Amino acid sequence: MTNWKLEISYIGKDFYGFQKQPGKRTIQGELEKVLSFLFDEEIRVIGAGRTDTGVHALGQVVNFKSRGHKGFSCDKLHKVLNRLLPEDIKIKKVEIVDDSFHARYSAKRRWYIYVVYNNDERDLFLKDYSWWISREINRELLIFSANLFKGVHDFKNFCVTEDEDQTVIEVYESFWYFKKDLLIYFISAPFFLRKMVRFIVGSMVEIALGRKSLIELEDYLKEERKERFSVPAPPWGLYLFRVDY
């Protein structure tokens, strides 16, 4: 068996997330359809991150196994995939890796970024790729709140928990980068819970708009609550940025 590793990017707005679903357009479904055709066998793709509906990726990593090369070098497969896949999925890199490599379980760290556009007027070309907030955001409060999420915390209050049994996570990095009207949040951890980054961003924005306090956020990080601190930020500002192995 040959174990292939792909680094891919995609625009998530017209997909129902990464994971394959019957009758719905997904990243996994599109990849498996093309790869199964090329290798003339049923191909199953494994992704490092199962992004939700509308979420984008700059550096998603997947792997799949095939019975042989079928005459494909890494370079040739790279080019053929980019010709056959839809325009909103791009293959960035193709490698043959050790049989033990698993895109999800071999990952050491995942990075996400979230883009906020803070201006009193909407930008037509950013509307599908960022969260537009017209009210002025207190950037200092964004910085302070991001620091609170760094370290080991139970994120039960900041995720969708129906099927999550491990909610204690160490967040390695949590910080904002500002470039004019673009506010870009970076976060890294070994893994993330469903909608976790969106709940974190939504919480920080609530504080930065003066609706909640840093003290309230600290309390939510210490003990489980029945009510959420905030609603999740919309999916179209979120990107799976990078996966480290």
Curated annotation (Swiss-Prot):
GO terms for molecular function: pseudouridine synthase activity; RNA binding; tRNA pseudouridine(38-40) synthase activity. Transmembrane segments: none annotated. It catalyses: uridine(38/39/40) in tRNA = pseudouridine(38/39/40) in tRNA. It comes from the Bacteria. This is tRNA pseudouridine synthase A. It is an enzyme of class 5 (isomerase). Its EC number is 5.4.99.12. SUPFAM superfamilies: Pseudouridine synthase. Substrate binds at Y112. GO terms for biological process: tRNA pseudouridine synthesis. It comes from Dictyoglomus turgidum (strain DSM 6724 / Z-1310). Belongs to the tRNA pseudouridine synthase TruA family. Homodimer. Keywords: Isomerase, tRNA processing. The active site is at D52. The keyword tRNA processing applies. Formation of pseudouridine at positions 38, 39 and 40 in the anticodon stem and loop of transfer RNAs.
